[in-house]
């Protein structure tokens, strides 16, 4: 997969945003880390897919509610309502990126250590239902 330099930086910014957001959660919802994670994540998405596609992605009719929740949650985090902002922003992230969860689960199943765990007959139906993976009834 060939990426331009801007897209490589976008991947780094997105990953950094994810890490800062995760560290913000681990430090009991630290406002600065959560806000920095949001900013880095948005910059990363912008650099990866470009300005026009970013605008189209966030303003699709089926993604508007997720976009609104994400932005309201980020705004509440900036206003020091970090826990409520985190909950609302998480709902927005699910609304925006919920379609990708099936792809993520399939990718994780191809990994050496976690793949057999996610493919175990007792765990696989639960993970498939949570991720929205459609399985043929055969």
Swiss-Prot record:
Topology relative to the membrane: Multi-pass membrane protein
Lumenal side: 30-31, 89-112
GO cellular component entries: COPII-coated ER to Golgi transport vesicle; cytosol; endoplasmic reticulum; Golgi apparatus; Golgi cis cisterna; Golgi membrane
This protein's UniProt keywords: Golgi apparatus, Membrane, Protein transport, Transmembrane, Transmembrane helix, Transport
TM segment ranges: 9-29, 32-52, 68-88, 113-133
Compartments where found: Golgi apparatus membrane
InterPro entries xrefs: Got1, Vesicle_transpt_Got1/SFT2
Record-linked Pfam families: Got1
Disruption-associated phenotype: Lack of GOT1 is lethal in a strain lacking SFT2.
Single GO biological process annotation from the record: protein transport
Keyword Calcium attributed: no
Stretches of the chain found on the membrane's Cytoplasmic side: 1-8, 53-67, 134-138
Superkingdom of this protein's organism: Eukaryota
Known role: Nonessential protein required for the fusion of ER-derived transport vesicles with the Golgi complex. Can be replaced by SFT2.
Annotated family: Belongs to the GOT1 family.
Protein name per UniProt: Protein transport protein GOT1
Source organism per UniProt: Saccharomyces cerevisiae (strain ATCC 204508 / S288c) (Baker's yeast)
